[in-house]
Amino acid sequence: MLVSTFLALFVLLFALGYVFLIKPIFSEDQEAADAPVRTEEPSAETNPMEGTDIPEEVLTPEPEEEPFDEFDIHVMMVGDDLLHMGLVNQGIQADGSRNYDFLFKDILDFVDAADIAIINQESPIGGNDRGFSGYPAFNSPTEAADAIAKAGFDVVLTATNHTYDQGLGGLKYFHDYFYKYPQISVVGTHSNLNEDSRTSHRGSYWLDKYGVSPNDRPRFDDLQLEPEDMVNTSAFVIREVNGVKIAILNYTYSHNWTTWANGLDGYLNRLCYYDPATREIDFDTINPEVLDDIKLAREVCDIVIVCPHWGYEYSFEPCAYQKDFARQMIDAGADVIIGAHPHIVEPVEYITTDNGNSGLCYYSLGNFIHCQVPNYTSFEGMAWVSIHVDKDGAKVDLDNSGALPLVEYQTWGPLYIQGVYPMEDFTADMAAHHASNFRGGGGMNLDLLHQWDSNLFGEYSLTKEDILGTASQTP
């Protein structure tokens, strides 16, 4: 009985506790349901994200990088434009005027396909009033320069061993004549004219702006030059293609003297060092200004091309100083070296220096146009440099760079220059009628041409299709 009483009392107390514990919960829920909905923004106290620094990349996703449209730039160069008197006379027309468009008629497709076309103007153009002359002291007609412009060349190299053939006055005339063609850059020489920014400067420009000439060393070296003038004091021009800056430099080993002429400093770009006391040229030592120019070009340009007039005439092999200078120039920052002067082709070589720099070197392209006798002087080369541009920058495309073998077709009776042809267009019949067969030049045949091509250009030998096919695909 007592147990039953306690059990009943426990059940009663449990029931009362349940009612008191549960009711407030249900009452609060009901009050919440009956309360109006709050529409104001939550305060900082109720919003734990308020005032929190959230990384921007979480809030705003980075836009996707736009794809870079890769493209190619093509640079071509031919060798010595050397107008002997036979060529000068061949350009005389029936009415007595002169025209030299025929010099380039067979390579116009390649000039057109190139973004930058370069020619080495071996014989100076010192002014028609001086009269015309061939070897040993050349002076070529101004109409030859007109033909260069009409053909579409962009850059004319003027630093050669014949540049000083007509003295300083002839050199200045040679340089200045091309100012009538603003699309052409001249590199290798300088004049006293106030030259514009498309070429290098020497002369009165500096006297007017800074009160000192580049010839007045070391005072000129101590100047604090503006950046564009640092470029303009050097021996290079800059050609820009689709935003890519390409520097072109040109120097000559000498002007056919063993000493450097008085008064010539600053007017003709010198490749070799000379003793300031005796002015004797040291042909085995590079002019340190050349390396300084290349280093500056490397800083301000994407691609650096150096065109030295160097080496020994009629040698198929580069001499010791060519090999030494080439490595020094590549060490300084040259991407490409394209040489001239020997009048015959020398090998193409890819050079890697001890410091890891590398560059493509054409030791000599040989002649382009001339009246020389030996058969090997008529085997020539056209450099074709392909530059690939991607989002990481510009670099030489070795797979699509090389040399197109050319042949100057001379006939005899009297001597007549028919033109300069790609070797693949030069036929056995043309070889049989080549002037070297009749004037003691050793004769000409296709086997000989192919042998030279294999030995000198080798893996870098190109065909017309290699060049024109690739160039036609470039946007």
What is each stretch, according to the model?
Residues 3-28, 41, 47-475:
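Acidic, metal/ion-coordinating pockets
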Residues 30-36:
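Juxtamembrane extracytosolic/periplasmic "stalk" immediately C-terminal to the first targeting helix
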